[in-house]
A protein has these predicted regions:
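Cofactor-binding active-site loop characterized by glycine-rich and histidine/acidic residues
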Residues: 15-18, 30-135
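Conserved small/polar residues in nucleotide/adenosyl-binding loops
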Residues: 136-143
Length: 146
């Protein structure tokens, strides 16, 4: 098993643990895009170890469909942006790891609040006017009028 395959396995384990511990969340979408997120964050994206909201000299990532936050949080933790142990606080009161990522929580790696499907597309297009950026979204934005 390669390092990437081991990481995919661990991220999937994190997702199941987070969702099961709270009896709440969207495991299907998160589990379905785990390989994409792991390869993107650990093999493709140009990113720095320490998160910088401005994203100078690195690729930008925006998550539009925030309901897949378990995979996003797990990958951010595994990338070293915050302690892996914090994953156990997913969807708990006063946790930075809510059902949809938000910027006011100050969580490293989160550039935009997500929730309204398609919102990330507009943000990513705006950022792309000045630099290279990456966006992952569900097919739903086409149906949301964005």
């Amino acid at each position: 098993m390669t390092g990437i395959q081991k990481l995919v396995f661990q991220v999937r384990r994190d997702i199941v643990r987070m969702v099961h511990a709270n009896n709440s969340g969207h495991p299907g979408g998160s589990l379905g895009c785990t390989e994409f997120f792991v390869v993107l964050f650990f093999d493709i994206m140009k990113r720095k170890k320490k998160f910088n909201m401005n994203g100078y000299d690195e690729d930008l990532f925006f998550l539009s469909n925030g309901h897949i936050s378990p995979v996003f949080y797990s990958v951010l933790a595994r990338a070293g942006y915050f302690p892996v142990e914090e994953l156990s606080t997913f969807r708990k009161i006063n946790s930075r790891l809510q059902g949809h990522p938000t910027t006011h929580e100050g969580l490293p790696g989160v550039r935009i609040a997500s929730g309204s499907l398609g919102q990330g597309l507009s943000v990513a297009i705006g950022a792309a006017l000045s630099k290279n950026c990456l966006l992952y979204t569900s097919p739903s934005p086409r149906d949301s009028g964005k």
